[in-house]
Structure formats: structure tokens, C-alpha cells
């Protein structure tokens, strides 16, 4: 059987080990070819090929349910659940999603994108099954990185107290998340997988035995001895999970189909919660990825032979993340109070550079955004200048801590929100749409966004120097605009002050962050139609520069707000509130992301679909100006 013939995972039933190995090779080949061509997650999926095949051969996927934590390791799952023919569309507009998506396949039982959710969701399914008197298996596959997340440990704690609730947790232990794992749990798991008795008993035991004199004759007795020794070792290394109420099995060689099949069959016999500890290699089967597991966690299109990214058509300016990291390092070198904090995203945020240069001023808390926020709050209490560098979408996970531990106590924590706005191929779980809305409503919070990478440097200085309370800066994924950068001598910006970039009497364009450059392009287009626009770089969504905005709105009378974020509760809403508070009844048109999910596509495709290209915005503004009402005031 060829991989292309598999449209249902139950077709794996009855296949021999040899046939499964052939399918495994074909999965890796398809996986590599697709990611090399279009980009995507590489290492995670390559590491779970045998795990996926062995697990699915022991399940009835017409009724049993498997949830993959995060989902970026689920490419093999997608390839054997009817998506082989469309897999070349991976992460492309209207194509196969890069993560699990309930709308995409009946085999994607729970959507994901953020870590540590699988055990909770699978336990919920198991409890619902039992309440309805049904009979199917529920399985969570979770990485050792995600297992460090508090939510996963909360679910383990709950499930362990339900001895008659049948569920299986598979711990995919490759000693990595995106970057190398940190923390006591990671250290414990590493000790388990490297335990000498288990290493000895797992490494080609039978093959080595047969090479000894009389090896064939004593093999049965020694295999029984091996089993006893391994159970003794496991009783020690699996003690934490056993004490929490799980039956622990492992560590198991995650690339041995024989061992995986036997283990999963055994695990399915237990009535209560079971944890199978599977040791895998991230990037398995592609030597370049195995040797550099951080870089090859995910890749843009690359050359399979060399592993190097395919050259772009033209050189790009440095990314916002790179400018952020390099500027932060220079500030940290001059102030030992400055500490960079990340939640398992050192490479993505650029803080790996800070770690390399100033390791004592760098903290990685693991996949623990809640802890990162309150840790920063505690450091701020002692006069430190904590800089929490985190993706916009992931800061959502620490929201209560932002309110309870930072804002209520008015502590000077600096939140740097990378990947704010439209991020592209990762889809709705990773879009940075909501931070303006969810931070703007919090007392004491200051919010700013740079128009370009040079202003990011100024805002970084502003945030670190600001000691009157919490402050946040959002900035996008990808390259800057190519403006000149200063090596030093940055001056902090006055809090809550905007800047006027262009003057005109026909329409007021109030832009925030990345939309400032677009507003300038729109103004150029409007000029060609005889329309003169005032363009304002708001800089701050909170506090708004009402001293500048209110008189301009009164004078010009037609206001358009521009933001790369959700419209409900966003920057445009803030402007509307300010105008109403000042009894200015100028018409306001808010342009941004409407109240909908933004699916996976390139950022340019998403912006075009949302009407956020310069030409689309200019056309909309021209339509507004056909009937321009005069400004008025509330009586």
C-alpha cells in the first residue's frame, strides 16, 4: 500500500511492520518535500511518524478520539486522514491548515495552536463519554515542552483523581519545545529518558545478546530479566506520575514500531488514566534537522540538500524582532536592572541574542505565560526593569495576571508584544488581533505602537524609562520599512503624544502602528484625486493625544481611523469614545479587522480580503467624501 491510497486511518489495520515502515518513509518524504516547497513546521512532525502509525493501528478512528497538543506535529496525522492529495496546499489560502481544525476534518477532534490544552480537552471528552454511557478511547498526545505548562499539570492533577476514567496521555518527549526546554519538570523528564538502566535495556538489547556465545539459548531468560529490571527502573523514574494517579509506562523508543505497538496495546487494557512516555528525536529522518533542532522547528521554503533557505528576490530590512533584541541588549549593557523575560520563545522574540550576550539578564520561564507576568511583577516590586517579550496571541494566556498582579498594583512592567496584527500562515490561533482591545480597558495601562523600526527603538527606551505603571508596545512580524537606525542616543517619547506627519483640510487619517505607513500611501493616492489629508501617527492608543485629535476632528470633520487589530474595542473605538466625551459629532469611519476570524493565508492576501490595502482604503475614503457632513456638537 502507498501513502496516497490511505484516505482513512483505519486502513492501517492489519498492515505488517514492514508495510508500516514503508508508509513511514513515504510520510517523511512527503512532509519534507511539502515544507521545503512552501514552508511550515518541520521537526515536530518528523519526530512522531512512527508514534502516529503505531497509535492509529491500535485504535478505531471511526469512534476513538485523538487530540494533538499544539498541533504543529500533526502533519503525519493529516497525511493519513484524507488530506494527502491537498497537502501541497499546506498553510496556503483556502488550503490545508497548519494546525488542527475541527472545520477541516472529522478526525481533527479539537482545534489547537497554543500549548498545553490537550489533556484538559481529552479528559472533558472522556467524562462526557462516561456520562452518556458510550464506549470509545480518548488520547492526548503532548510534548514535553507543553507538559511544563500549568494547564497541562492542572489537567494531570484532575485526571489522576478519577481512577475509573479511561484516558491515555502520550508524552512525546524530544527534550525540546521550540527552543530547548527549561525548568524542573523538563529536567525530571530528561532524567527519566536518560536513566542508565533504561538506556541499557533499550539500546539494541536483543541484537547485542545474539552476538554473545550461547546468546540464542539464554535469550528468553534474559529477556524476562530485562523486563523485571525495566519495571524496577520505571517504578522509580515514573514515580511522579504514579503518585498523581496515572499508570506510567515507559520510556518507550518512539521510533521502534514494534515497541510502540506492544506498548499502546498494553495501555489500552487499563481502565483508568495511563501515561505512556515516548522518547523521540525532533526532525527524525532528516539529518540536518536532527542536528539543529531549534532552527528546523519551522522553516520558510528551503533547499532540501543543503537545508538553507531559498534566497529571496531582494534583500530585506532587519525584522522588528531583530531591532528590538539588538536595542534591548544595548540598553541592558548600560543598566543591570533591565531583564528580558520570555515564555519558551527565545528565538522568536530575539531574546536568544540577549541570552548569549548577557545571560544573567535573561529569563526563560518555559511555556508559562501566567508565571512570566507575575514573575515580572515581583521583579518590578524590587526596582528591576522587567521586559516581558511575548507574542500578542500568547499574552492572552496571562490576562488575569496582567490585571490582578500588574495593573491593580500599578507596577512598572514593560510588555513587548511581538507578532501583533496579521501574522499569516499560522491562522486564527496565532493572529495578534486582540491586544489593543484587551489591554486598553485596563486601568493604569499605557499602550503604544511604532510606525517603523526606528520608532520602535524610541519606544523601547520609553518603556524601560517609564516607572509610573505598566506599559505595552505592540509591533508586527517581519521586516521593518528600511528606515535609518540609531546606534545609541535614543530619547524617550512623551507619554500620550502623537505626531502630525501631513496637513490637509479634507479628511483626517488617524493611524496606529503599522497603519501609519499605509495612511501615508493613502494620502498620496488621495492627492491624485484632489483630496488633501491630514495624517497623524497616534503612537499611543492609551492615553490618546486628545489635545491634538479633538481640534483636528472639529476642524476637518471627517475622521478615518486605521489599525491592524480587531475593531471591537480597538483604537478606532478609543477615538470614538474620546470624541463623544468631548461632544464632537464628527463622522468617524473605523478601518481595521472586523469581528471575524482571520484564516491562514499570506499577510498580503489577508489584508486584501479585509480591505486593508492602500488602494482599497483610498477608494473607501473617496466614497466617504462624496457626501461630507459638517462637524457638529452635542447640545
Swiss-Prot record:
Cofactors (names): Mg(2+); thiamine diphosphate
InterPro entries in UniProt? Dxylulose-5-P_synthase (IPR005477), THDP-binding (IPR029061), Transketo_C/PFOR_II (IPR009014), Transketolase-like_Pyr-bd (IPR005475), Transketolase_BS (IPR020826), Transketolase_C (IPR033248), Transketolase_CS (IPR049557)
A biological-process GO annotation: isopentenyl diphosphate biosynthetic process, methylerythritol 4-phosphate pathway
Identify the keywords attached in UniProt to this record, alphabetized: Isoprene biosynthesis, Magnesium, Metal-binding, Thiamine biosynthesis, Thiamine pyrophosphate, Transferase
* Cofactor binding summary note: Binds 1 Mg(2+) ion per subunit. Binds 1 thiamine pyrophosphate per subunit.
Record EC number:
2.2.1.7
UniProt-listed CDD domains:
TPP_DXS (cd02007), TPP_PYR_DXS_TK_like (cd07033)
In this chain, Mg(2+) is annotated as bound at 144, 174
Q: What job does this protein perform?
A: Catalyzes the acyloin condensation reaction between C atoms 2 and 3 of pyruvate and glyceraldehyde 3-phosphate to yield 1-deoxy-D-xylulose-5-phosphate (DXP).
Q: This chain belongs to which protein, by name?
A: 1-deoxy-D-xylulose-5-phosphate synthase
Amino acid at each position: 500500500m502507498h501513502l496516497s491510497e490511505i484516505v482513512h486511518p483505519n486502513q492501517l489495520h492489519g498492515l505488517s511492520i514492514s508495510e508500516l515502515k514503508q508508509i513511514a518513509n513515504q510520510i517523511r518524504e512527503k512532509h519534507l518535500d511539502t515544507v521545503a516547497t512552501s514552508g511550515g513546521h518541520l521537526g515536530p512532525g518528523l519526530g512522531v511518524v512512527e508514534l502516529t502509525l503505531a497509535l492509529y493501528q491500535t485504535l478505531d478512528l471511526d469512534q476513538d478520539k485523538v487530540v494533538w497538543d499544539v498541533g504543529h506535529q500533526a502533519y503525519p496525522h493529516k497525511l493519513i486522514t484524507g488530506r494527502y492529495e491537498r497537502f501541497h496546499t499546506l498553510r496556503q489560502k483556502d488550503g490545508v491548515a497548519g494546525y488542527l481544525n475541527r472545520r477541516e476534518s472529522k478526525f481533527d477532534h479539537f482545534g489547537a495552536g497554543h500549548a498545553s490544552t490537550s489533556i484538559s480537552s481529552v479528559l472533558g471528552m472522556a467524562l462526557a463519554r462516561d456520562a452518556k454511557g458510550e464506549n470509545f478511547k480518548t488520547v492526548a498526545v503532548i510534548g514535553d515542552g507543553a507538559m511544563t505548562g500549568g494547564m497541562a499539570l492542572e489537567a494531570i492533577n484532575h485526571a489522576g483523581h478519577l481512577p475509573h476514567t479511561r484516558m491515555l496521555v502520550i508524552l512525546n518527549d524530544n527534550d525540546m519545545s521550540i527552543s530547548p526546554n527549561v525548568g524542573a519538570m523538563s529536567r525530571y523528564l530528561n532524567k527519566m529518558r536518560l536513566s542508565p538502566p533504561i538506556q541499557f535495556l533499550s539500546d539494541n538489547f536483543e541484537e547485542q545478546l545474539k552476538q554473545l556465545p550461547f546468546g540464542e539459548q539464554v535469550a528468553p531468560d534474559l529477556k524476562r530479566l530485562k523486563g523485571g529490571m525495566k519495571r524496577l527502573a520505571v517504578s522509580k523514574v515514573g514515580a511522579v506520575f504514579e503518585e498523581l494517579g496515572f499508570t506510567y509506562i515507559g520510556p518507550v523508543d518512539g521510533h521502534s514500531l514494534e515497541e510502540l505497538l506492544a506498548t499502546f496495546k498494553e495501555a489500552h487494557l487499563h481502565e483508568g488514566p495511563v501515561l505512556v512516555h515516548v522518547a523521540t528525536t525532533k526532525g527524525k529522518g532528516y539529518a540536518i534537522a536532527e542536528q539543529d533542532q531549534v532552527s528546523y522547528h519551522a522553516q520558510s521554503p528551503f533547499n532540501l540538500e543543503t537545508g538553507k533557505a531559498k534566497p529571496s528576490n531582494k534583500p530585506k530590512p532587519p525584522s522588528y524582532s531583530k531591532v528590538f533584541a539588538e536595542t534591548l541588549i544595548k540598553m541592558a549593557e548600560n543598566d543591570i536592572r533591565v531583564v528580558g523575560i520570555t515564555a519558551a520563545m527565545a528565538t522568536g522574540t530575539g531574546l536568544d541574542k540577549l541570552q548569549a550576550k548577557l545571560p544573567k539578564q535573561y529569563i526563560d520561564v518555559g511555556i508559562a505565560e501566567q508565571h512570566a507576568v507575575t514573575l515580572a511583577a515581583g521583579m518590578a516590586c524590587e526596582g528591576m526593569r522587567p521586559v516581558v517579550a511575548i507574542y500578542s496571541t500568547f499574552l492572552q494566556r496571562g490576562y488575569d495576571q496582567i490585571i490582578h498582579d500588574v495593573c491593580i498594583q500599578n507596577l512598572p512592567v514593560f510588555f513587548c508584544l511581538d507578532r501583533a496584527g496579521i501574522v499569516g500562515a499560522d491562522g486564527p490561533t496565532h493572529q495578534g488581533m486582540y491586544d489593543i482591545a484587551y489591554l486598553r480597558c485596563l486601568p493604569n495601562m499605557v499602550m503604544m505602537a511604532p510606525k517603523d523600526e526606528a520608532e520602535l527603538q524610541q519606544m523601547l527606551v520609553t518603556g524601560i524609562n517609564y516607572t509610573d505603571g505598566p506599559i505595552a508596545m505592540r509591533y508586527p512580524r517581519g521586516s521593518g520599512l528600511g528606515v535609518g537606525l540609531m546606534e545609541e542616543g535614543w530619547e524617550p517619547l512623551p507619554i500620550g503624544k502623537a505626531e502630525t506627519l501631513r496637513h490637509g483640510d479634507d479628511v483626517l487619517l488617524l493611524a496606529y502602528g503599522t497603519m501609519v505607513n499605509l495612511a501615508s500611501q493613502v494620502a498620496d493616492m488621495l492627492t491624485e484625486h484632489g483630496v488633501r489629508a491630514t495624517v497623524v501617527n497616534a503612537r499611543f492608543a492609551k492615553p490618546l493625544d486628545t489635545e491634538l485629535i479633538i481640534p483636528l476632528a472639529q476642524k476637518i470633520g471627517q475622521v478615518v481611523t486605521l489599525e491592524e487589530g480587531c475593531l471591537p474595542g480597538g483604537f478606532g473605538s478609543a477615538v470614538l469614545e474620546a470624541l463623544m466625551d468631548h461632544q464632537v459629532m464628527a463622522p468617524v469611519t473605523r478601518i481595521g479587522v472586523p469581528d471575524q476570524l482571520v484564516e491562514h493565508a499570506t499577510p498580503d492576501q489577508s489584508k486584501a480580503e479585509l480591505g486593508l490595502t492602500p488602494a482599497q482604503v483610498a477608494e473607501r475614503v473617496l466614497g466617504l467624501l462624496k457626501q461630507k457632513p459638517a462637524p457638529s456638537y452635542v447640545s
